[in-house]
Amino acid sequence: MINKKYIYLGTIFLFLVIIKLINPPIIKKISFVNHDFYQKMFNRGEVKSVTIVDIDEKSLAKIGQFPWRRDIYSKILDNLNQHNPSVIAFDIVFSEEDKQNPKDLLLQLQKESDEFLDVKVTNTNQVFIDSLKRSKVVLPVIGEPNDNFIENNSEPKLRLIVKGDDPKNFIYRYKNKITSLENLNSAAKGIGSISLLPNIDGIIRNVPILYNIDNKIWPSLALEAVRVATGQKNLLVQSDKNGIQLIKTRKNIIPSDQNGVINIKYKKFDKKNYISAVDIVNNDFDQKRIENKIILIGSSAQALFDIVKISNGKTVPGVEIHAHIIDNILKNENIVKNLITQITENIIFLILIIFLIFIPTKIKPKFSIIFFIGSILLTNILSIVAYQFNFYLDALFPSIAATVMFMTSLYFRYLEENSIAIENEKKQSILKKEREIAGEVQKKLFPSNKKIEKYIFAKNTPAKDVSGDYYDYYQVNENE
């Protein structure tokens, strides 16, 4: 029974270890539940270094349908620049010429009629380019996994210093790119990727900080915005055969995993950090919300379909994701989940379930239950404490696995003790039967007792003279 018990326990142990290492979707979802719970419970702090210029419903209603003419963006840039922003980053790709450009419309009319030959109009593309040159602007790039037939030779503005293996071997790769027009990118101070990686349940929990797009290394929009805002030119990337080990600017260390992915620590983002784009156009806003802030220009309008769900349970505009990443980078506060935390998590997992295989079988049942509860509590407390220091260790799956092992171990202990109890009961039954048989044998060894009737009976008669003496006697029966 003992050998069979350990065979079953060993099989379950191996099964749990294998699925932990393989990490199939169901295990990922279990870990996501734990991760999201922490994000909701320990959602401390506030993003204060970023302001979002919001292309909202109000702006669409007053300015008109989207996309807008480029001179509107030019006006937004010029009005923002009056109040000394650290950097302005667009969450909008300008991949085509301005279709509402009066210059282009005039050229079309001039082809059809000579009446418009002497008319002069503004070239909104050029107006926008001029504003870009006067500003500290970061434009976006998007990774495209399929063939892209639009040739664009724009290259990263970031200067990369690589130590160790080539980072392109480890970071997320896209075959091609979608980005703004080359003349716009040339006028910008930086270019960063806005590609997001939703998890299997569609929630944004982590994003790459570096991308391999078109066989070139591009930073994320958030990282590029921080670089331009702080006046840095270089980014150090250190890697080895296991992947990315270090991403560092002059002022910030960015703890990513081996694939250059960071886990976002979401904080409170006050609605006051949003300014309607139309208010910027009309120059009707509080300048303190712009001064020395990193400005993101994006959209919260439902019609533009840039709404995502994040791990603290909220649904937010996609541009707000970049705001949280920027805050994490500036404060070195993103959640660390890398090779070291994974190894630590696996060691805790193994120790926990091994203990719960052997120890409960060696102590009394009531103490084994106390040990089990204590082990689960200790694992979760360790996970929570680690999270306070921005390290993520999943406690939910180890707790579930430990419960399975403990219940299985307890079940086999019950079977074993029940088997022993049944065996003892059989022995007691045999002993009882043997005692009964021995008693019967012993009875047969003693002589049989004569049945005595009316034992307490006497008859007193007068004394008789026998040879000169007098005697009394008692008659018990007729013969005695």
What are the residue ranges of the model-derived segments?
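Non-transmembrane functional regions of envelope-associated proteins
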Residues: 2-252, 290-371
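Aromatic-anchored segments of alpha-helical transmembrane domains
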Residues: 16-20, 375-385
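Generic recognition of well-ordered alpha-helical segments
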Residues: 225, 322-325, 401-410, 441
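Active-site Gly/Thr loop motif
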Residues: 254-275
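Central hydrophobic cores of alpha-helical transmembrane segments
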Residues: 368-378, 398-401
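Loop-to-transmembrane alpha-helix initiation sites
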Residues: 389-403
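Juxtamembrane or sensor-core-proximal signal-transducing alpha helices
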Residues: 401-426
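… and, occasionally, acidic/histidine-rich disordered N-termini of signaling adaptors
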Residues: 423-480
